[in-house]
């Protein structure tokens, strides 16, 4: 069995692409391939690493998260996936209209005018 261990020195972005069951039913595989193909097309392979995972935002499926900026994207279609690579990864500009969360040094916050659901609190109350 072969095990892959990537050397990520020099990597500028890590994109976590949701491939959980909800995301897969809503185009997660297509979004994954669109991101990876556009990264290759723009010769960004050395700067961008992608990982398939479940991001826990099923209502916003499919979801992609870009680090180090901490931007969470919702409903990533092939078109949005291409824009994430072209405008965010290559161009440095977030797609504000597609954000669920962005990072502001205090933590993740929902952008103004977000239509995404708030979700379930991760911290259990003592009540």
Swiss-Prot record:
Cofactor(s) needed by this chain: [2Fe-2S] cluster
Cofactor: record remark: Binds 1 [2Fe-2S] cluster.
InterPro entries tied to this protein: Thioredoxin-like_sf
UniProt family annotation: Belongs to the 2Fe2S Shethna-type ferredoxin family.
Alphabetical list of Gene3D superfamilies matching this protein: Glutaredoxin
Any GO molecular function: metal ion binding
The entry's keywords: 2Fe-2S, Electron transport, Iron, Iron-sulfur, Metal-binding, Transport
Protein name: Putative 2Fe-2S ferredoxin
Residues that, per the record, bind [2Fe-2S] cluster: 23, 54, 58
Organism of origin: Priestia megaterium
Function of the molecule: Ferredoxins are iron-sulfur proteins that transfer electrons in a wide variety of metabolic reactions.
Highest taxon of the lineage: Bacteria
């Amino acid at each position: 069995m072969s095990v892959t261990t990537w050397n990520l020195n020099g990597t500028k972005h890590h994109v976590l692409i949701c491939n959980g069951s909800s995301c897969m039913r809503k185009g997660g595989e297509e979004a994954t391939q669109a991101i990876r193909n556009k990264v290759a097309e723009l010769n960004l392979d050395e700067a961008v690493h992608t990982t398939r995972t479940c991001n826990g935002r099923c209502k916003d499926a499919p979801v992609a998260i870009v680090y180090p900026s901490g931007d969470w994207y919702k409903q990533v279609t092939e078109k949005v996936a291409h824009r994430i690579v072209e405008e965010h990864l290559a161009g440095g500009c977030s797609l504000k209209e597609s954000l669920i969360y962005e990072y502001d040094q205090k933590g993740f916050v929902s952008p103004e005018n977000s239509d995404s659901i708030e979700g379930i609190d991760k911290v259990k109350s003592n009540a």
